[in-house]
Regions:
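Residue-level micro-sites within transmembrane alpha helices that shape
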Residues: 4, 76-77, 120
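Single conserved hydrophobic/aromatic residue that forms the stacking wall/gate
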Residues: 1-13
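Low-complexity, acidic/Ser/Thr- and charged residue-rich accessory regions of DNA metabolism proteins
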Residues: 60-64, 98-140
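Phosphate-backbone recognition surface of nucleic-acid-processing proteins
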Residues: 17, 23-24, 28-107, 111
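ATP/adenylate-binding site constellation spanning eukaryotic-like Ser/Thr protein kinases
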Residues: 9, 42, 119
Length: 140
């Protein structure tokens, strides 16, 4: 918390508060992701975190189900899985990430599949909110 205040990121941290992200996971996610503006699009942030489906194609063959790429820092994936675990324990019905994971779980998807899909969706929403906030700062 003190790190966030000392860096002048308290306003960003407070505005971007999402379910499952608290006093310890918020700064950890911000530290692991770094400057969000360096990612050109939302798929770049999920690729960096390693929660995007890996490509498996050659010629006319294209696999429908592939493993996660697992590129990027494992600490970031660990923090994302902790956020997903918090979402599953608190069950916030108004959270789009929880609803998405609950839908995947109801479809009978394996644990790692819906946790990884939830982390992917979380990052895409996080990226959008931070970019929107930074754009509003530039407008002022």
């Amino acid at each position: 918390r003190d790190l966030v205040r000392s860096r002048g990121l308290g306003d960003v941290y407070k505005r971007q508060a999402m379910h499952g992200v608290g006093d310890s996971l918020g700064p950890q996610l911000m530290a692991e992701l770094g400057d969000v503006t360096r990612f050109t699009h939302r798929n770049a942030i999920t690729a960096f975190a390693g929660v995007d489906p890996g490509a498996d194609q050659s010629g006319t063959h294209e696999a429908k189900s592939t493993r996660v790429s697992k590129s990027g820092p494992p600490e970031l994936r660990r923090a994302l899985f902790l956020v997903m675990d918090c979402l599953l324990k608190t069950m916030p019905q108004d959270d789009p990430v929880y609803r998405f994971m609950d839908k995947k779980r109801a479809e009978g998807k394996p644990y790692l599949v819906y946790m990884t899909a939830g982390a992917n969706k979380f990052l895409r929403i996080y990226y959008g909110r931070v970019k929107e906030y930074l754009a509003s700062l530039e407008g002022n």
